[in-house]
Amino acid sequence: MLVPMRRVLVLLSLVLLVATPALADNVRGTRGNDNLVGTAGPDRINGLAGDDRLQGLGRNDLLVGGPGNDTLFGDAGNDTLRGGPGDDTLLGGAGSDRIAGGAGRDTIVGGNGDDRISARDGEVDRIACGKGRDQVVADGIDVVSRDCERVRRG
């Protein structure tokens, strides 16, 4: 079935976007487990509750996980990734990303670019930065990779 341009198809907690690259899309998930994929343009994707998988694809995306054990992929562009309560995996990809974990034991990978990573939640998080000049604000108990150039413990 072909989906007309700029339409959102919702089927069993699966959202598929098809749009022109120059336009931004705003997508909200459900209280269930969602698989939300953005477009080549800038997107705002909010997974809400559930164990969600969010992927931005291109441009400068905002991905918000919400409660649950979420996986967020920024891909290309200068993205903003925000975890939430739960054990999240946050992957920035190429570009200078802003990544913030939430309550839970998160795994954060900045990827290529000058990333800003925040992981101050009082639980053990694992952080890797990748290429670029990265800044990390982390708890004293967090495991921070040696490839993170500037690390501040709080």
Q: How would you name each of these model-derived features?
A:
Residues 1-8:
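Positively charged n-region of N-terminal signal peptides that target proteins for export
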Residues 10-18:
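Bacterial N-terminal signal peptides
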Residues 20-26:
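Sec/Tat signal peptide C-region and signal peptidase I cleavage site
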Residues 29-32, 38, 47, 55-58, ...:
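Glycine-centered beta-turn/loop sites at beta-strand termini
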Residues 33, 42, 51, 60, ...:
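Consensus positions within tandem repeat domains that build extended binding/scaffold surfaces
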Residues 119-154:
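Leucine-rich solenoid repeat scaffolds
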